[in-house]
C-alpha cells in the first residue's frame, strides 16, 4: 500500500508540476499529440470500408484527416505566438465573425442529412458552429474580467447580458439545426458564470430555465423526440430509429476487455453509420476493448485537468482573462467528451458532437487544436511572470 501511495503521489506530482525551467507545459503538448495520433489511427481504421465504397481509395479519409492534422498543427503554432491581451482586446471582433459565419451557413450552407451546418471551402467544409464555440468562450472570458463585480452583484446588468448574447447565437444554431452545440455552449457558459462568482440562486434558476428550454426544443421537433425515445429503448425499433445505437452497443459488446484487435471491427463494415465521425468511440471500444477506451478517456480527461490547473495558475498570477478561458476550455472538452461517449454507449441521446482531437472533421480538429494552443499560451505567460518575479527576488537579495 505504501508503494502504491508513493507511485500515486509521484505520478500526481509529475502531472501537476511540469519542469520549472521550461517555457511551456510539455506534458500538455504530449497529451494533445497522443490524442491526435490516436485519432489518426482510429479514423484510418474506422473509415476504411466507407472510403473504399465511396472513392475506391481505402485511405481517402486517412489522407484528408492527416491533411487536417497538419493544418491544425500549423495553425496552432501561429496561434501560440499571439499574446493573451490580443485575444481579450479583439474578442468582440471574433464574436462578430462567428455571427457572420452562422448567418452565411443558413443562406449558402451545404446540407447533409437535412442539416445545413457547413460552408464549402474547397479543401474542406467549414463548420461555423465550432468557430462559434471558441469565439463565445473568448468573448465571455473578456466580459467576465470587465464586468466581474456586476456579475456578482446584479441579475440583469451582469448575469443576463451574456445570456442574451448566447441566446442570439443559439437562435442561429437552431436554424441549422444544431441543438448539440447549443447545449455544449450553455453548459460551458453556466460553468464560467459560476466560476466568476454568480449568485447560486440566480445560477440555479437559470439552469432550471435552460433545462426547460432544452426539453421544449426537443418536444417541438418530431425527429428529436424520436431520438430520445430510441435512446430510451433502441431495441424497440432496432432496424429503424434505434438502428445506429443498437449497432454501437453491439460494437461495445464485441470489444469486451481487450478488444478484437486494431482493424478487426465488424460493425464498421457498413453496419454502424458515421463510424469515423460521431461514433468513432464505438469502433475504439470494439477494437481496443474496455482497457483501451479507459486509457484514451484518461488521456482526454488528463487534458481537462491540465486546463483546470492552468486556469488556477492564471488566477494566482492575476491573469483573470486566461483563468476564465482555461476553465471554459476545460469544461467544453469535458462535457463534449461525456456527450459523445454517452451517445455511443446509449446513456444520452445522439447529438452529433465529435470526440475532442480524435473524431474525423477538419473544423473540429483545427478549432480544438487552437484551444489547446491557447492553453499553452496561458501557461507560457504564467511562467514568464514567475520567472520575472524570481529574477526580481534574486536582484533584491544581491542588493
Swiss-Prot record:
Pathway: Cell wall biogenesis; peptidoglycan biosynthesis. Keywords: Cell cycle, Cell division, Cell inner membrane, Cell membrane, Cell shape, Cell wall biogenesis/degradation, Glycosyltransferase, Membrane, Peptidoglycan synthesis, Transferase, Transmembrane, Transmembrane helix. The keyword Manganese does not apply. Residues 49-64, 113-118, 176-177, 221-289, 342-354 are periplasmic. GO terms for molecular function: lipid-linked peptidoglycan transporter activity; peptidoglycan glycosyltransferase activity. Its main location: membrane. It is found in: Cell inner membrane. It is a multi-pass membrane protein. This is Probable peptidoglycan glycosyltransferase FtsW. Belongs to the SEDS family. FtsW subfamily. It catalyses: [GlcNAc-(1->4)-Mur2Ac(oyl-L-Ala-gamma-D-Glu-L-Lys-D-Ala-D-Ala)](n)-di-trans,octa-cis-undecaprenyl diphosphate + beta-D-GlcNAc-(1->4)-Mur2Ac(oyl-L-Ala-gamma-D-Glu-L-Lys-D-Ala-D-Ala)-di-trans,octa-cis-undecaprenyl diphosphate = [GlcNAc-(1->4)-Mur2Ac(oyl-L-Ala-gamma-D-Glu-L-Lys-D-Ala-D-Ala)](n+1)-di-trans,octa-cis-undecaprenyl diphosphate + di-trans,octa-cis-undecaprenyl diphosphate + H(+). Peptidoglycan polymerase that is essential for cell division.
Amino acid at each position: 500500500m505504501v508503494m502504491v501511495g508513493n507511485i500515486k503521489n509521484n505520478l500526481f506530482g509529475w502531472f501537476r508540476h511540469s519542469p520549472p525551467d521550461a517555457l511551456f507545459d510539455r506534458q500538455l503538448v504530449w497529451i494533445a499529440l497522443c490524442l491526435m495520433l490516436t485519432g489518426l489511427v482510429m479514423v484510418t481504421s474506422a473509415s476504411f470500408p466507407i472510403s473504399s465504397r465511396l472513392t475506391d481509395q481505402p485511405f481517402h479519409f486517412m489522407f484528408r484527416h492527416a491533411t487536417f492534422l497538419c493544418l491544425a498543427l500549423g495553425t496552432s503554432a501561429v496561434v501560440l505566438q499571439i499574446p493573451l491581451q490580443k485575444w481579450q482586446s479583439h474578442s468582440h471582433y471574433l464574436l462578430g465573425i462567428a455571427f457572420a459565419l452562422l448567418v452565411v451557413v443558413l443562406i449558402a450552407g451545404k446540407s447533409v442529412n437535412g442539416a445545413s451546418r457547413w460552408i464549402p471551402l474547397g479543401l474542406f467544409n467549414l463548420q461555423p458552429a465550432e468557430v462559434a464555440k471558441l469565439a463565445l468562450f473568448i468573448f465571455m472570458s473578456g466580459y467576465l474580467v470587465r464586468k466581474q463585480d456586476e456579475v456578482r452583484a446584479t441579475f440583469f446588468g451582469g448575469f443576463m447580458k451574456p445570456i442574451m448574447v448566447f441566446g442570439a447565437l443559439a437562435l442561429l444554431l437552431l436554424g441549422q439545426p444544431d441543438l448539440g452545440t447549443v447545449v455544449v455552449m450553455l453548459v460551458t457558459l453556466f460553468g464560467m458564470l459560476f466560476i466568476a462568482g454568480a449568485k447560486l440562486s440566480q445560477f440555479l434558476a437559470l439552469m432550471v430555465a435552460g433545462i426547460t428550454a432544452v426539453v421544449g426544443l426537443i418536444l417541438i421537433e418530431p425527429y428529436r423526440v424520436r431520438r430520445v425515445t430510441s435512446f430510451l429503448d433502441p431495441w424497440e425499433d432496432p432496424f429503424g430509429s434505434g438502428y445506429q445505437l443498437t449497432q454501437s452497443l453491439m460494437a461495445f459488446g464485441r470489444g469486451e476487455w481487450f478488444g478484437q484487435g486494431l482493424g478487426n471491427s465488424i460493425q464498421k463494415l457498413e453496419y454502424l453509420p458515421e463510424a469515423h465521425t460521431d461514433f468513432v468511440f464505438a469502433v475504439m471500444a470494439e477494437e481496443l476493448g474496455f482497457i483501451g477506451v479507459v486509457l484514451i478517456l484518461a488521456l482526454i480527461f488528463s487534458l481537462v485537468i491540465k486546463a483546470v490547473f492552468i486556469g488556477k495558475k492564471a488566477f494566482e498570477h492575476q491573469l483573470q482573462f486566461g483563468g476564465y478561458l482555461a476553465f471554459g476550455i476545460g469544461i467544453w472538452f469535458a462535457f463534449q467528451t461525456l456527450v459523445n461517449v454517452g451517445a455511443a454507449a446509449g446513456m444520452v441521446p445522439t447529438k452529433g458532437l465529435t470526440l475532442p482531437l480524435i473524431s474525423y472533421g477538419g473544423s473540429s480538429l483545427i478549432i480544438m487544436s487552437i484551444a489547446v494552443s491557447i492553453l499553452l499560451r496561458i501557461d507560457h505567460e504564467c511562467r514568464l511572470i514567475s520567472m520575472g518575479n524570481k529574477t526580481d527576488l534574486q536582484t533584491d537579495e544581491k542588493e
